A protein has these predicted regions:
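Extracellular hydrolytic enzyme modules, especially secreted metalloproteases
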Residues: 103, 108-249
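Trp/Gly-enriched beta-strand/coil motifs that build multi-repeat beta-propeller-like domains
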Residues: 320-459
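Zn2+-dependent metallopeptidase catalytic core
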Residues: 1-139, 154, 206, 211, ...
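Non-catalytic C-terminal accessory/binding modules of secreted extracellular proteins
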Residues: 15-26, 46, 119-129, 206-321
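Acidic glycine-/aspartate-rich tracts in secreted/extracellular proteins
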Residues: 16-19, 110-113, 149, 176-177, ...
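A short, structural micro-pattern
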Residues: 5, 163-165, 253-255
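Short, flexible N-terminal segments of the mature chain
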Residues: 27-53, 261-265, 332-352
Length: 459
């Protein structure tokens, strides 16, 4: 089932004549009006923003779900405990069904802790003193069938609650914040196409925060899924972009801003736990910010490479995956004996299509199929070397050899001359070479430069 479109919800005030040893229920002067305010228009006393149930559902679903609220006449019972499976509650539910409602919420007085909902059923129960998050969670249980995904007794991997997705997901801690991208997708509030599926070794992604309206704009994704089978990782951006992700008078909002990474550990479409594992295992109790990274026990690295007011950029690297054809690898060498290994992927693909590649200083030079000379900047960090500067407008594919040293580019022309070009790294044509070798340079087996020296291997 899914909460899509507008659902008719009956809110039934329930007064208990027996509450001992708890204090007696005190009926508010305008109980019906108070319920309707909580359902449809409930300005926060601190911020003034609407934190009603309807505002939350519309925001969390990006307008896919809505509700029509009706407050029914008060019901009176002469007992303290009211359970959803009690005979009179089931009879009440049937009367609401007969009137065309999609769900009914029994609204009680007294202290918090009454919140419950029939997963995929019809009835929810909560009290007036419970916060928006509880009202939303219990009705989401009813109308989506989705379960609680918090840590529970008997789970083997909660680590004292540190790994609980907690206040990053409404369906874990009922704090009135947005659900994760995983949960939104499960209840059809987020299209699967909004979540990128990472394949191969390395890839970069621009994240659109989960709390903003979905789907994301072109070029961005709501989350990245890493892995095709359970368990798999998810990475998403969280920012305090609205009244539900931000703190309010009564609820804390999300714990931190940045990128969170969590492991999905259940195949159940409605989030039920399996094998005594928490459904969502949080790898980042504090969200990652620019420059920070996390590495999973399966050698999946997620690095935040940049931030902006409307999201984050991340780099995902599966360090156990083979390198992809056409990637550019960067190896470090400190000059000591041993194998130069553990390369960094600095070009994600397409580098095999160039007709020539060489490096000088902190620049990488490439000759494309049109004979242009491209200059790329590289600081040696993981990421995609991109956005080249065209420093040679054409004809560079005609040289017999190309190499660089410092800020000089050397080329051997068809006549065997060695030409020296200057490059400041700025856009423009590298031209007006100096002839530094008058002939015979095409006869060498290899040519390269280091510092202010040129080296040649004779045949």
């Amino acid at each position: 089932m899914a909460w899509l479109g507008t659902k008719r919800i009956a809110f039934v005030p329930l007064y208990r004549t027996v509450t001992q040893p708890d204090p007696p229920d005190v009926i508010p002067a305008d109980w019906n009006g108070d319920i309707m305010r909580r359902a449809l228009n409930d300005p926060d006393a601190t911020t003034g923003a609407d934190r009603s149930l309807r505002a939350y559902i519309r925001a969390a679903s990006s307008g896919r779900a809505d509700l029509e609220a009706t407050v029914m006449p008060m019901v009176t019972v002469n007992r303290k405990d009211v359970r959803l499976d009690d005979a009179d509650m089931q009879q009440l539910a049937q009367r609401m069904r007969d009137q065309g409602f999609d769900a009914a919420a029994i609204v009680m007085l007294g202290g918090p802790g009454a919140g419950t909902g029939q997963e995929g059923g019809f009835l929810a129960r909560f009290v007036m003193r419970e916060k928006l998050g509880t009202w939303a969670m219990e009705l989401m249980h009813v109308l989506t069938g989705f379960t609680d995904i918090r840590c529970r007794p008997g789970f083997t991997d909660c680590e004292g609650g540190v790994r609980d997705i907690g206040n990053f997901d409404e369906m874990a801690f009922n704090g009135g914040m947005h659900p994760t991208a995983y949960t939104k997708a499960a209840i059809q509030w987020l299209d699967a196409s909004a979540i990128a599926n990472h394949t191969g070794r390395i890839g970069g992604y621009d994240l659109h925060p989960v709390g903003l309206n979905q789907p994301p704009p072109s070029g961005k994704v709501a989350a990245v899924r890493i892995g095709s089978q359970v368990p798999y990782l998810m990475a998403e951006a969280r920012l305090k972009v609205d009244q539900f992700e931000s703190p309010s008078q009564l609820e804390p909002g999300i714990p931190s801003e940045g990128v969170i990474v969590y492991r999905v550990q259940t195949t159940d479409p409605l989030g039920h736990p399996q094998n005594n594992h928490i459904p969502l295992y949080l790898l980042t109790p504090t969200a990652l910010t620019a420059g920070q990274s996390v590495v999973s026990d399966t050698d999946i690295a997620v690095t935040v490479t940049g931030s902006a007011p409307d999201g984050f950029s991340i780099l995902v690297e599966n360090r156990r995956a083979p390198f992809d054809h056409g990637q550019l690898l960067s190896y470090g060498d400190n000059g000591t004996p041993g194998n130069v290994s553990d390369p960094v992927v600095v070009g994600f693909g397409g580098w095999a299509d160039f007709t020539a590649l060489f490096a000088g200083g902190d620049r990488i030079y490439a000759v494309d199929q049109a004979g242009q000379l491209l200059s790329y900047g590289d600081n040696g960090n993981p990421g995609n070397v991109s956005n080249p500067v065209v420093v040679g407008f054409g004809g560079w594919g005609s040289f017999r050899a190309l190499f660089a040293g410092g800020d000089r580019i050397y080329a051997v022309d068809q006549g065997g001359r060695l030409l020296s070009y200057g490059d400041s790294g700025t856009p423009g044509n590298v031209s007006d070479p100096v002839v530094v070798g008058f002939g015979g340079w095409g006869d060498f087996r290899a040519l390269f430069a280091g510092g202010n020296r040129i080296y040649a291997v004779v045949r």
